[in-house]
């Protein structure tokens, strides 16, 4: 029998929440603003949790170098903020998993590369995150995932 864990940390995008459609919708809006073809869900699905840089790279392809990437990121984040939880859902079994951790008095938290202001906008949409003990966002500490600082700061 395994010992009871002292705590559990989860990633957010692509682990607890399926945010791919809302992230992809923001990407496609930015592409539309620049008269670029939209990007299919099947193309961006596995890239969505890589954040704005990865999405812009797949959406703009070789033409990304023709643009100010920081301006594109700002436009992307502005649009994503407006529609942060339209199609986002928790993955199957997550509510039950978190409820079980809570029932067993196992503290749990989230370590994400999503900026804090977006994390704080998104999490309240999901009741299952009410018992979350700690949230470390991409800009909470000096280093973000995959650097171990987020884990070692616990």
Spans of model-derived segments:
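Substrate-recognition "cap/lid" segment bordering the active-site pocket of phosphatases
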Residues: 86-89, 115-154
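Short helix-capping segments at alpha-helix termini
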Residues: 32-38, 62-65, 103-104, 127-131
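Substrate-recognition element of Asp-dependent hydrolases with the DxDx(T/V) motif
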Residues: 27, 94-124
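An amphipathic alpha-helix signature
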Residues: 24, 28, 45, 49-57, ...
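Helix-loop "lid/cap" segments that line or gate small-molecule binding pockets
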Residues: 30-31, 51-65, 122, 154
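Metal-dependent phosphoesterase signature
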Residues: 57-99, 104
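Active-site neighborhood of HAD-like aspartate-dependent phosphohydrolases
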Residues: 1-46
């Amino acid at each position: 029998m395994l010992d009871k864990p002292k705590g559990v940390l989860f990633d957010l995008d692509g682990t607890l929440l399926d945010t791919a459609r809302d992230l992809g919708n923001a990407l496609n809006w930015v592409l539309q603003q620049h008269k670029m073809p939209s990007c299919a869900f099947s193309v961006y699905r596995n890239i969505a949790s890589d954040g704005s840089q990865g999405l812009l790279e797949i959406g703009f392809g070789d033409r990304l170098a023709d643009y100010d990437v920081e301006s594109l990121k700002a436009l992307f984040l502005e649009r994503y903020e407006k529609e942060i939880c339209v199609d986002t859902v928790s993955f199957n079994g997550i509510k039950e998993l978190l409820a079980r951790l809570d029932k067993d008095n196992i503290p749990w938290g989230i370590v994400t590369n999503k900026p804090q202001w977006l994390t704080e906008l998104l999490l309240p949409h999901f009741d299952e995150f009410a018992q979350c003990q700690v949230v470390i966002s991409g800009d909470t500490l000096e280093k973000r995932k995959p650097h171990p600082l987020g884990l070692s700061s616990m």
